[in-house]
């Protein structure tokens, strides 16, 4: 079927092992596994705290594959850099809710919500990430309902609300 994709656990395990050999200075390694036009599937491995980030125009859908860690969600992101497409990274994430993560956990992070992935001390955290374009109701962006945000840098999305 056009657009169909099946990623088996054995294949993810192979990618996980390869990523572990390619850890960069930012304590992470990543690989785009599949591209589907306006969204993609990535595998990320972290062996140290990830930089805080927020995405104005994308939802992060995450499935923890291996390891242990914590997701910090929400709070205030300060001192970050905003790049193309509303991608904000770096700086300091103050406050936010903490969620323990383990293999099999499934996470939906709405657009514009600051977050950071923190592996457990001395451990790693590997997760499958689906970056999906955010679609806003007409009341949240100019134009017609169902329109994808285009670099507006803001939504009315709040932590704990969908």
Q: Residue spans of the language-model regions?
A:
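An anionic, turn-rich surface loop/hairpin at beta-sheet edges
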Residues: 80-102
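Conserved metal-binding segment of the jelly-roll/cupin
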Residues: 100-121
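A short hydrophobic beta-strand segment most commonly corresponding to one strand
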Residues: 122-140
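His/acidic/aromatic-lined binding-pocket segments of jelly-roll/cupin-type domains
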Residues: 53, 60-63, 98-99, 106-107
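Short hydrophobic/aromatic-rich beta-strand segments that constitute the beta-sheet cores
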Residues: 43, 71-73, 117, 127
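Short, conserved beta-strand element in jelly-roll/cupin
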Residues: 56-76, 85-92
